[in-house]
Amino acid sequence: MGLIFSAVGEVYELSEEQFPVFSAIAGASGAFIHLYIDALASAGVKNGLSRNFAENLACQTVLGSAYLTKQSDEHPIELMDTVCSPGGTTIEGVHTLKILGFESAVHQAIDAIIEKDKKLGSC
């Protein structure tokens, strides 16, 4: 069975206890990424880019970052640090996202999905 599925993607073996977390991340994160891409594009439009160009730019940036993370042996935070110059614009944006609770919001969203899954008895 794994051979069939591996032809179209990666196959993971996990325990029953891990399935709700897997399902939350694999199932919902696509929606989160679409939301993030839209937020990037909307910020671009707000600051003078056309919608089409801003969406394409956001998509290409997310694709490139995801590809680099997948291909690299470095932790995502290490990769982030490579593009954050001390005192620069990128670290300023990262700092702002952290202050506004970006990571916490993602964690809370995953936790909410797992809790909802438990209430629905899906897993």
What do these predicted regions represent?
Residues 25-26, 31-37, 123:
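Catalytic, metal-anchored helix/loop core of enzyme active sites in primary metabolism
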Residues 25-26, 49-51, 78:
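A ubiquitous short alpha-helical element
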Residues 1-21, 33-71, 116:
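Internal alpha-helical scaffold of NAD(P)-dependent oxidoreductase catalytic cores
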Residues 23-25, 84:
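Short glycine- and Lys/Arg-enriched binding-loop motifs that mark or flank ligand-binding interfaces
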Residues 55, 59-123:
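NAD(P)-dependent Rossmann-like dehydrogenase/reductase catalytic/cofactor-binding core
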Residues 10, 27-30, 88-89:
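Gly/Ser/Thr-rich helix-start
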Residues 21-23, 92:
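A short acidic, helix-capping loop that chelates divalent metal ions and anchors anionic groups
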